Amino acid sequence: MKVLTARQQQVYDLIRDHIAQTGMPPTRAEIAQQLGFRSPNAAEEHLKALARKGVIEIVSGASRGIRLLMEEETGIPLVGRVAAGEPLLAQEHIECHYQVDPAMFKPSADFLLRVSGMSMKDIGIMDGDLLAVHKTEDVRNGQIVVARIDDEVTVKRLKKQGNMVHLLAENEEFAPIVVDLRQQSFSIEGLAVGVIRNSDWS
């Protein structure tokens, strides 16, 4: 499995986009300039890391000697810690990409979210697991959702009644979270569609 850091993914995306726009890869200097590196040498180090992971091939002796090897469409971004008020899929929140086919989940997964805590343990969602999430606001009562309440993101079972939303844990030690839609900001970020046990990828 090829796992890219957020910075490595930025370099990879820049190479891919440059090829799509110009028909050729960028030079080290262009990568450094675009991503704010201090020198082309810093870009070279990231390219070497990408080559070691097998997602690009470096062709020696050519300033634009970069060839893409990774089929990007099988990668699902892993969202790390989310800062208050910022979009869940903002680039700076993406820790890495997991080479998992999104279509193995129904509906397909758009991103992975690292589970924190044991509030959903009774249905097999454990601390440290990677929750596969389909990005949608179209959810029904009884489904496991990723919800945002006043800038905090949580994973719970949804129960909506009029202006009140109850987010239910699957662990009797955790009380429901009650949201009054007339007073609090609330949105649905996505629907849980599966779990990847993190130990499966070690």
UniProtKB/Swiss-Prot annotation:
DNA-binding region: 28-48
Keywords: Autocatalytic cleavage, DNA damage, DNA repair, DNA replication, DNA-binding, Hydrolase, Repressor, SOS response, Transcription, Transcription regulation
Xref: InterPro entries: LexA, LexA-like, LexA/Signal_pep-like_sf, LexA_DNA-bd_dom, LexA_repressor, Peptidase_S24_LexA, Peptidase_S24_S26A/B/C, WH-like_DNA-bd_sf
GO MF annotations, alphabetized: DNA binding; serine-type endopeptidase activity
Gene Ontology BP terms: DNA repair; DNA replication; negative regulation of DNA-templated transcription; proteolysis; SOS response
Annotated site, Cleavage, chain positions: A84, G85
Reaction(s) the record says it catalyses: Hydrolysis of Ala-|-Gly bond in repressor LexA
EC number: 3.4.21.88
Statement: the UniProt record of this protein carries the keyword ATP-binding: no
Active site positions, chain numbering: S119 (for autocatalytic cleavage activity), K156 (for autocatalytic cleavage activity)
Entry keyword annotation includes Transcription: yes
Function: Represses a number of genes involved in the response to DNA damage (SOS response), including recA and lexA. Binds to the 16 bp palindromic sequence 5'-CTGTATATATATACAG-3'. In the presence of single-stranded DNA, RecA interacts with LexA causing an autocatalytic cleavage which disrupts the DNA-binding part of LexA, leading to derepression of the SOS regulon and eventually DNA repair.
Record-stated family: Belongs to the peptidase S24 family.
Subunit-structure text: Homodimer.
Annotated PANTHER family: LEXA REPRESSOR, LEXA REPRESSOR-RELATED
The name this protein goes by in its record: LexA repressor
Originating organism: Pectobacterium carotovorum subsp. carotovorum (strain PC1)
Classification lineage: Bacteria, Pseudomonadati, Pseudomonadota, Gammaproteobacteria, Enterobacterales
Gene: lexA
